[in-house]
Curated annotation (Swiss-Prot):
Composition-biased stretches (Low complexity): 9-25
Endpoints of the signal sequence: none
InterPro entries xrefs: COG6, COG6_C, COG6_N
GO biological process per UniProt: intra-Golgi vesicle-mediated transport; protein transport
Localization annotation: Golgi apparatus membrane
Function field: Acts as a component of the peripheral membrane COG complex that is involved in intra-Golgi protein trafficking. COG is located at the cis-Golgi, and regulates tethering of retrograde intra-Golgi vesicles and possibly a number of other membrane trafficking events.
Superkingdom in the source lineage: Eukaryota
Origin organism lineage: Eukaryota, Fungi, Dikarya, Ascomycota, Pezizomycotina
Gene name, Swiss-Prot/TrEMBL: cog6
Renumbered residue ranges of the record's region Disordered: 1-36, 601-620, 702-736
Compositional bias ranges of the Polar residues kind: 601-619
Protein name from the UniProt record: Conserved oligomeric Golgi complex subunit 6
Species assigned in the record: Aspergillus terreus (strain NIH 2624 / FGSC A1156)
Membrane topology qualifier: Peripheral membrane protein
Length: 752
């Protein structure tokens, strides 16, 4: 056993005791003692007091309170050894107690081991006896868990797929109301029907088929109940009431999932609304309106004597009713966004057999369906409107009123096209009525033309050669038509909406209301034998017509150019007439006819290329020979000059008076001015030819005079008894210019 004191301390005490000579009888010799002492001293001296063991020993001594005396030093070893022995004895006693306790523990452990062995034997026996019971209990527990799982599955299946009898009664019984519970149950049954498809994916499809068949029957019964309930509600539905029941809107959204029932319901609704609106239209036409309108509001039939107002009132009522009907149907069918469209689309997808083409993708257009429903609601109103409009138009013979009605119908056709679509029944009806009205308008125009053609008195031109009265009346009607068209469509050239090509929609009116009358008026000019009167008469007709349509671009676009072309041709004719009048009245025509061979057109030869090879080139006439022409003989030329002098003072007034019956003064003035200018050019030509002839004769006379001077002596004896020949030679010596002294400048001044 280890010591309670450090080993160094004990050894130090032993060494101290051994230093005494009498410490032991077995002490070694002195030499050995001396060596041992020396070694001891050396050891003591070499010991380091910084050693931890020495420090601990010193600390222990310090704690024991030992004083450094000789007695203490002598007894220290013994005391320490005694303490060591006592400590060891105490330890031995303690270990003895521990040994006894260990023996008792060993006995207990042996007893426990024996008991455990016995228990093991009992456990083995018990295990052998309980193993079948435990196995059976485990099997029963597994069966219990399986039964509980099946029970949970059955409860969940029953809760999800089986509808109770009470719920089925709410869903299918006609006595039960259509409320929130009905729609919730219907949604649940639809979900069950959809989930049955999962059951059909298993090996045993019997349960899925039975449940699907049962849910289908329940759904059909529910939809039939909903269909009948909606029909019942439609009978008492008031679309004018802004508070339309939300339940009927929801019912319509749900019923939309069955397109066949939904369309049948819409058919019933359309028939009911058609009856209601037809009755309301008849009431507005014939019965006095009471209530808010008061006595000032009268039936539409009161204005039947005025076709435009009568038809306008009917169209206004139809338009107002259409707008109200569309707004009411929008609140009924489209108030909740696209829910109805989604339901109908789902129904179309669920009924693929309803498609005409298997590959066709059916899509639902809500706005188009709404417009179609409004059209169907107004079927009776449209039929009554058509009958009344046609009767009014057929019984009226004023073309202006007919055209105003046609424009009114065109306006409402555009309005209904925007409201219900371009292919809606109302738009087609108004287009048909518009065409009917225009055909009646054209018929009235043809009848007027036929009547005028048979009235010979009306076809005789007036004395002042103005446009015939029937044409002026037709132009007055045309003016009213153009004003109506301008008020309806504007002054620009309008086109039909349905055509991409630019088509003037007023052109048919012009062809019916202007062209026949204009052609008839032009044909009456054949009654005038005088070409001048005939030209003036035709000019007045075209001028009057052009002035009427010139202010309207849509009329000028098609007819102004032909009228201007005809006027240009007539202007040329009048110019030729005026020119010929000036030439004949002044006598200048005789001189021009005589000078025809000397004109540039004659000297250049014929212009007809077909005769170029057949005619020989004529020799250039001698200008000096003009004096030998009959028209330029002194007497004739003096007479022509005198006639010209008599004509010039009043020439312009006479020429202007010649066209005084042309009803456009500026037109007549311009024609006269051009005719005067042409006359001046002709006179200038004659003047030039006369001067040229005199100059040519002067050259010939100089040559002849020289020859005469050489023969003067021999000629002096000739007979001079013929006085007439001498006078004639004297007059020829004066020259043509002196016989015809007028100049072009004087002519222009006198005719300006």
């Amino acid at each position: 056993m280890a010591s309670y004191f450090p080993p160094g301390a004990a050894s130090s005490h032993v060494s101290t005791r051994s230093s005494s000579p009498a410490s032991s009888p077995l002490s070694p010799p002195a030499q050995q003692r001396s060596n041992a002492l020396s070694n001891r001293l050396t050891s003591v001296l070499s010991a380091s007091y910084a050693d931890s063991d020495i420090r601990d020993a010193l600390e222990t001594l310090s704690l024991r309170g030992i004083h450094n005396t000789a007695e203490v030093r002598r007894q220290l070893r013994l005391d320490v050894q005694k303490e060591v022995v006592d400590s060891n004895a105490e330890i031995v006693r303690d270990f003895g107690k521990v040994a006894e306790q260990l023996k008792r523990i060993g006995t207990v452990i042996s007893s426990l081991n024996q008991t455990c062995e016995e228990m093991k034997k009992h456990i083995v026996l018990a295990k052998q006896d309980t193993t079948p019971v435990l196995e059976e209990a485990a099997s029963l527990m597994n069966q219990k868990r399986e039964a509980e799982t099946k029970q949970q599955l059955l409860d969940a299946f029953t809760k999800h797929f089986i509808v109770s009898e009470e719920d089925l009664l709410i869903l299918t019984s006609a006595e039960e109301p259509i409320d929130e519970r009905f729609f919730d149950l219907l949604s649940r049954v639809k979900q069950v029907h959809r989930d049955c498809e999962v059951l059909l994916g298993g090996e045993n499809q019997r349960l899925g088929l039975e449940l699907m068949e049962k849910s289908s029957r329940n759904l059909n019964s529910a939809y039939q109940k909903l269909y009948k309930w909606i029909q019942k509600e439609f009978r008492s539905l008031n679309l004018e009431d802004p508070r339309i029941s939300s339940s009927i809107r929801r019912a319509l959204r749900v019923l939309a999932e069955r397109p066949s029932l939904f369309h049948s319901c819409l058919d019933f609704f359309a028939e009911a609304r058609d009856y209601v609106l037809s009755d309301a239209f008849h009431y507005a036409l014939t019965d006095a309106v009471t209530g808010a309108g008061g006595d000032n509001v009268k039936p539409i039939e009161f204005s039947a004597h005025d076709p435009l107002r009568y038809i306008g009132d009917m169209l206004a009522w139809v338009h107002s009713t259409t707008v109200s009907e569309r707004e009411a149907l929008e609140s009924l069918f489209v108030a909740d966004g696209e829910e109805l469209a989604k339901g109908i689309q789902a129904g179309l997808n669920s009924e693929p057999w309803s498609r005409l083409d298997e590959d066709e993708t059916v899509s639902f257009d809500g706005q188009k369906a709404l417009s179609d429903l409004v059209n169907r609601d107004l079927t009776g109103v449209s039929r009554s409107l058509r009958q009344r409009v046609e009767l009014v138009i057929q019984g009226h013979d004023d073309p202006v009123t007919c055209y105003k009605v046609a424009n009114l119908l065109s306006f409402y056709r555009g309005t209904f096209s925007k409201l219900l679509g371009p292919r809606s029944n109302l738009a087609d009806l108004l287009e048909t009525l518009e065409k009917f009205t225009l055909r009646h308008f054209e018929t009235l125009m043809r009848n007027q033309v036929n009547t005028l053609s048979a009235d010979h008195a009306a076809l005789i031109p007036s004395d002042d050669l103005s446009a015939p009265e029937f044409l002026q009346d037709a132009l007055d009607v045309l003016t009213a038509l153009m004003k109506t068209h301008e008020a309806s469509f504007g002054a620009d050239v309008s086109t039909d909406d349905g055509d991409n090509d630019s088509v003037n929609r007023f052109a048919p009116v012009l062809r019916a209301a202007l062209d026949p009358f204009l052609e008839l008026a032009k044909s009456t000019a054949d009654e005038l034998p005088n070409p001048t009167a005939r030209a003036i008469y035709l000019t007045n007709i075209h001028l009057t017509t052009r002035s009427t349509i010139a202010a309207y671009p849509f009329a000028s676009a098609t007819h102004l150019t032909p009228l201007s072309t005809a006027l240009s041709s007539l202007r040329v004719d009048l110019l030729a007439i005026q020119h010929r009048y000036l030439l004949d009245a002044s006598g200048l025509q005789v001189l021009l006819a005589a000078l025809e061979p000397f004109s540039p057109s004659s000297t250049n030869g014929p212009s007809d290329t077909a005769n170029d090879g057949q005619q020989q080139k004529q020799p250039q006439p001698d200008i000096a020979d003009i004096a030998n022409l009959p028209a330029f003989q002194p007497d004739a030329l003096v007479a022509t000059s005198q006639q010209l002098d008599d004509f010039l003072p009043s020439a312009l007034m006479d020429a202007t008076d010649n066209l005084k019956r042309v009803q456009n003064a500026s037109f007549a003035k311009s024609v006269t001015e051009e005719a005067v200018e042409a006359f001046c050019r002709d006179f200038e030509f004659v003047e030039g030819m006369i001067i040229g002839a005199d100059e040519a004769r002067a050259k010939v006379d100089v040559t002849r005079d020289r020859a005469v001077e050489d023969d003067s002596a021999s000629d002096s004896d000739k007979d001079k008894d013929e006085d007439g020949d001498e006078d004639e030679d004297a007059e020829k010596g004066l020259g043509l210019r002196r016989l015809f002294p007028r100049t072009t400048g004087e002519i222009r001044v006198l005719l300006s």
